[in-house]
């Protein structure tokens, strides 16, 4: 028997193009992305968690969604159906492309030297890059769904599709990535 995500989408054929993110994007076959916090509390264990579950956990950020994992799972499943209908592609593949395009490659850190503080450009680790991309996709979804006629699933589908195309005008995640990289470039 073949294991598919939500019993609909196969994740075994998806290839992560970015070599740095390959070890952190987990696409192991799973029916329902819910591990009950099995991988929490230990360093780097989140890399073993399915990428869709990490997206669901990030979407449970808003006040009204806190702790409601089943509601958030249904939002993600509906968003994946919308993505599949619009693009005729595997929605998990589109999500992986969105994460590759939505994570910043360099950031700034504050360095204090002799009582003077200044910003220094640094490379971003793949784990932080993935965390930032997931966080920005979730925040962009929640911001666009707030006080809007569109459902959260439609807003999530739009955010993922625009981020996978690297559309800076319409994707919150790509816009934040470009902003961080621009600040880092000026701090070189």
From Swiss-Prot:
Keywords: Ribonucleoprotein, Ribosomal protein, RNA-binding, rRNA-binding. One of its GO terms (cellular component) is small ribosomal subunit. It comes from the Archaea. Disulfide bonds: none annotated. Gene3D superfamilies: Ribosomal protein S7 domain. InterPro entries: Ribosomal_uS7, Ribosomal_uS7_arc, Ribosomal_uS7_dom, Ribosomal_uS7_dom_sf, Ribosomal_uS7_euk/arc. One of its GO terms (biological process) is translation. GO terms for molecular function: rRNA binding; structural constituent of ribosome. Part of the 30S ribosomal subunit. One of the primary rRNA binding proteins, it binds directly to 16S rRNA where it nucleates assembly of the head domain of the 30S subunit. Is located at the subunit interface close to the decoding center. PANTHER family: RIBOSOMAL PROTEIN S7. Belongs to the universal ribosomal protein uS7 family. This is Small ribosomal subunit protein uS7. It comes from Methanococcus aeolicus (strain ATCC BAA-1280 / DSM 17508 / OCM 812 / Nankai-3).
């Amino acid at each position: 028997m073949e294991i598919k995500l939500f019993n609909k989408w196969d994740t075994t054929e998806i290839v992560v193009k970015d070599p740095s993110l390959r070890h952190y994007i987990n696409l192991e076959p799973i029916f329902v992305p819910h591990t009950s916090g099995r991988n929490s509390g230990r360093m780097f264990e989140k890399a073993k968690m399915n990428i869709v579950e990490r997206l669901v956990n990030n979407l449970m950020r808003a006040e009204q969604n806190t702790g409601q994992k089943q509601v958030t799972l249904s939002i993600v499943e509906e968003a994946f159906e919308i993505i599949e209908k619009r693009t005729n592609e595997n929605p998990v593949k589109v999500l992986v492309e969105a994460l590759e395009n939505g994570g910043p490659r360099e950031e700034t850190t504050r360095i204090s030297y002799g009582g003077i503080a200044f910003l220094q450009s640094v490379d971003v680790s793949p784990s932080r890059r993935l965390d930032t991309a997931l966080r920005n996709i979730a925040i962009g979804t929640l911001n666009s769904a707030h006080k809007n006629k569109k459902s959260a699933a439609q807003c999530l589908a739009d955010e993922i599709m625009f981020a996978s195309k690297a559309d800076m005008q319409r994707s919150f995640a790509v816009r934040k990535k470009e902003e961080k990289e621009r600040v880092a470039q000026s701090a070189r």
